[in-house]
């Protein structure tokens, strides 16, 4: 079945408002986690043209492993507490980093990444990974991104 994404213009909030029901439609009736993660990353990349967007999933109690993503080649494994992703996982909270060069222990998978937001991904109350979104511009992410990306992640917790 072919799926078309309606790309919207307008403010960041308007774009998320338009995208949210489309992502919900993509996920409805599909139980395969990899397929759903892949469609979420593709939709976010298509709508916002983020430099990199993808998931890391818990592989062992101390390591995340790369999952579906859109963008340049990425780091394959990230230890708990390392970099933005590992820290967000360890702390189980969203991290917004306006300038990745100023984040202690930042893992530079790409020198072109300038700012980042990482959100925990939950399944039935347990953290199973993180959503990582990178921009090639400084200060790209804010509370609007956090609000809507959190809503998108809640759609995956079914």
Swiss-Prot record:
SUPFAM superfamilies reported for this sequence: GAF domain-like
Question: Residue limits of the GAF domain?
Answer: 32-158
**What range does the record give for the signal peptide?**
none
Q: Can you supply one Gene Ontology CC term for this chain's record?
A: cytosol
Q: Which GO terms describe its molecular function?
A: L-methionine-(R)-S-oxide reductase activity
Q: What Pfam family does this protein match (any one)?
A: GAF_2
InterPro entries assigned to the protein according to its UniProt record, in alphabetical order: GAF, GAF-like_dom_sf, Phosphatase_reg/MetRdx
Instruction: Give the protein family.
Output: Belongs to the free Met sulfoxide reductase family.
- UniProt-recorded name of the protein: GAF domain-containing protein A
Q: Which organism is it from?
A: Dictyostelium discoideum (Social amoeba)
**Organism phylogeny:** Eukaryota, Amoebozoa, Evosea, Eumycetozoa, Dictyostelia
């Amino acid at each position: 079945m072919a799926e078309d994404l309606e790309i919207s213009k307008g403010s960041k909030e308007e774009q998320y408002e338009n995208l949210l029901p489309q992502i919900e439609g993509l996920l409805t009736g599909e139980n395969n986690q990899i397929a759903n993660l892949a469609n979420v990353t593709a939709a976010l990349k298509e709508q916002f043209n983020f430099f990199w967007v993808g998931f890391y999933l818990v592989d062992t109690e101390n390591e995340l492993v790369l999952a579906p993503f859109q963008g340049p080649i990425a780091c394959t494994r990230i230890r708990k507490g390392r970099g933005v992703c590992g820290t967000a996982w360890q702390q189980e909270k969203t991290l917004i980093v306006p300038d990745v060069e100023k984040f202690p222990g930042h893992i530079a998978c790409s020198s072109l990444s300038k700012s980042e937001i990482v959100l925990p991904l939950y399944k039935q109350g347990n953290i199973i990974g993180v959503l990582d979104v990178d921009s090639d511009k400084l200060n790209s992410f804010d509370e609007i991104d956090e609000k809507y990306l959190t809503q998108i992640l809640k759609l995956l917790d079914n």
